[in-house]
UniProtKB/Swiss-Prot annotation:
One of its GO terms (biological process) is antimicrobial humoral immune response mediated by antimicrobial peptide. This is C-C motif chemokine 4. GO terms for cellular component: extracellular space. It comes from the Eukaryota. Its main location: secreted. Homodimer. Interacts with CCR5. One of its GO terms (molecular function) is chemokine activity. Transmembrane segments: none annotated. Belongs to the intercrine beta (chemokine CC) family. The gene is CCL4. It comes from Canis lupus familiaris (Dog). SMART domains: SCY.
Amino acid sequence: MKLCVTVLSLLVLVAAFCSPALSAPMGSDPPTACCFSYTLRKIPRNFVADYFETSSLCSQPAVVFQTRRGRQVCANPSEPWVQEYMDDLELN
């Protein structure tokens, strides 16, 4: 009886650790960052160090600006100031 309880407990632990790894289909990478809202204010340009665009798997497109202090700020890619910052960062 003790052996059955031990084996069953071990199987439950193995299943608990393996199921998240197996839940996504092979070859599908979940998006690393998605934005669900945009900043309402224009960020000062001198605060921005870098940017990246969110994955097409996200529910809405966004540009994520990385500030010099390491914060990430989501912005609407259709805003003119966002496009301007992206162009400027590409040139530098």
